[in-house]
Curated annotation (Swiss-Prot):
PANTHER family in alphabetical order: COAGULATION FACTOR (PTHR24278), COAGULATION FACTOR X (PTHR24278:SF28)
Residues the record lists as 4-carboxyglutamate modifications: 46-47, 54, 56, 59-60, 65-66, 69, 72, 75
Glycosylation sites: 92, 254
Disulfide bonds: 57-62, 90-101, 95-110, 112-121, 129-140, 136-149, 151-164, 172-328, 216-221, 236-252, 376-390, 401-429
Function noted in UniProt: Snake prothrombin activator that attacks the hemostatic system of prey. This protein is functionally similar to blood coagulation factor Xa.
Localization terms from the record: Secreted
Extra remark: Is classified in the group D of snake venom prothrombin activators, since it requires the mammalian factor Va for maximal activity for the cleavage of prothrombin. The venom of this species does not contain its own coagulation factor V-like. 2 isoforms of notecarin D (D1 and D2) are described in PubMed:12403650. We chose to name this protein D1 according to the masses indicated in the paper.
Enzyme Commission numbers on file: 3.4.21.6
Name the UniProt record assigns to this protein: Venom prothrombin activator notecarin-D1
Active-site positions on this chain: 251, 308, 405
Family annotation (SUPFAM superfamilies): EGF/Laminin, GLA-domain, Trypsin-like serine proteases
Subunit structure: Heterodimer of a light chain and a heavy chain; disulfide-linked.
Source species taxonomy: Eukaryota, Metazoa, Chordata, Craniata, Vertebrata
Organism: Notechis scutatus scutatus
Gene3D superfamilies: Coagulation Factor IX, Laminin, Trypsin-like serine proteases
């Protein structure tokens, strides 16, 4: 009987196993549905917390509505959502001519500046020389309804019709040893200073005009020329314009019995290494008003140093090199409308580093901001004529001084350096409320070209 009972129990157990399995193990579809991770709903604490873009849309995938709840601003939401969905379509800067790019989903939109159109603002509707210089690297002029670019001497127009390509190693205005990290300028906080009108001096006395400048390294001011008198002393500066022409101030010419020229030097104390170049002829502008004489203008303004410009013709050509390169001569329009609307120009020379102190043995250079004409005129007790302009600082002790006269005022544009002024005069050196006064080269372009064309 016992064996029969045991057998019945075993059979009953085996018969119940399939039913037990079905109760313990779920079917695959049901199990997968059960194990899927569902999005966690915010707890009551999270619901009352301010929206957080990282929690809502980065840690978890969010909807546009959730993003809007975070930003609480439709425009900001659209900007974020366009990038969030498929990346930033504007990252490659697709808009030409300084157009503004707005990202979209799978696309972008360019907002073009005036006179430009097209998906990427690539089409020029109406070019003007007054808008970004007509996109010209050097000179721009209007021909019918289009702009036409041209280049300074020793450059050729690039195939794009805008750029200028140097035709030689020593083309004008090329600063071959240009400063890289050590810019020929003053710190940003200095350059940002605006010219401020201060009270006029009660004792005006026009004085030949670098105070507190930096050393100009070899080849960094390659257009600088130095005028030497019969005693071997520096008395003025100049600017190389061509192998046989040096531009200077007219008032420099009557200061000595003879004139020699030195180029390519940054330290004139080493007399044994410097080479004096002989002068063939000097051309002084016939309307020049000398410093020892001034006339009373019809408006009763005292005028001196007007037409302060002269050109020296060399007996033998100047040999160009990395350290000796001429400055480029601009057109009048380019100088007035482009160069003189830049923030600043560069002035260099061997003049006195302090008022009534000895001249410097080393070449100095400073960056001087342009001063608007109204401020310039009100700052001086002497008349600022149309042939002059002001540059410098109203409070900082940075200026040209005695011995710098005749030297270059250079303005750079697209890595080419153009002559824009001649150091002429000032009321003292680096005086508070006073600026350096320069001969405005753009007023004399025809005269300069005429003299340079003489045989």
């Amino acid at each position: 009987m016992a064996p029969q009972l045991l057998l019945c129990l075993i059979l009953t157990f085996l018969w119940s196993l399939p039913e037990a399995e079905s109760n313990v193990f779920l079917k695959s579809k049901v199990a997968n549905r059960f194990l899927q991770r569902t999005k966690r709903s915010n707890s009551l604490f999270e619901e009352i917390r301010p929206g957080n873009i990282e929690r809502e849309c980065i840690e978890e995938k969010c909807s546009k509505e959730e993003a809007r709840e975070v930003f609480e601003d439709n425009e900001k939401t659209e900007t974020f959502w366009n990038v969030y969905v498929d990346g930033d379509q504007c990252s490659s800067n697709p808009c030409h001519y300084r157009g503004t790019c707005k990202d979209g989903i799978g696309s972008y939109t360019c907002t073009c500046l005036p006179n430009y159109e097209g998906k990427n603002c690539e089409k020029v509707l109406y070019q003007s020389c007054r808008v970004d210089n007509g996109n010209c690297w050097h000179f721009c002029k209007r021909v019918q309804s289009e702009t036409q670019c041209s280049c300074a001497e020793s450059y050729r127009l690039g195939v794009d019709g805008h750029s200028c390509v140097a035709e030689g190693d020593f083309s004008c205005g090329r600063n071959i040893k240009a400063r890289n990290k050590r810019e020929a300028s003053l710190p940003d906080f200095v350059q940002s200073q605006k010219a401020t009108l201060l009270k006029k001096s009660d004792n005006p006395s026009p004085d030949i005009r670098i105070v507190n400048g930096m050393d100009c390294k070899l080849g960094e001011c390659p257009w600088q020329a130095v005028l030497i008198n019969e005693k071997g002393e520096v008395f003025c500066g100049g600017t190389i314009l061509s192998p046989i022409h040096v531009l200077t101030a007219a008032h420099c010419i009557n200061q000595t019995k003879s004139v020699s020229v030195i180029v390519g030097e940054i330290d004139i104390s080493r007399k044994e290494t410097r080479r004096l170049l002989s002068v063939d002829k000097i051309y002084v502008h016939t309307k020049f008003v000398p410093p020892n004489y001034y006339y009373v203008h019809q408006n009763f303004d005292r005028v001196a140093y007007d037409y302060d410009i002269a050109i020296i013709r060399m007996k033998t050509p100047i040999q160009f090199s990395e350290n000796v390169v001429p400055a480029c001569l601009p057109t009048a329009d380019f100088a007035n409308e482009v160069l003189m609307k830049q923030d600043s120009g560069i002035v260099s020379g061997f003049g006195r580093i302090r008022f009534k102190e000895p001249t410097s043995n080393t070449l100095k250079v400073i960056t001087v901001p342009y001063v608007d004409r109204h401020t310039c005129m009100l700052s001086s007790d002497f008349r600022i004529t149309q042939n002059m302009f002001c540059a410098g600082y109203d409070t900082l002790p940075q200026d040209a001084c005695q011995g710098d006269s005749g030297g270059p005022h250079i303005t750079a544009y697209r890595d080419t350096h153009f002559i824009t002024g001649i150091i002429s005069w000032g009321e003292g050196c680096a005086r508070k409320g006073k600026y350096g006064v320069y001969t405005k080269v753009s007023r004399f372009i025809p005269w300069i070209k005429k003299i340079m064309s003489l045989k």
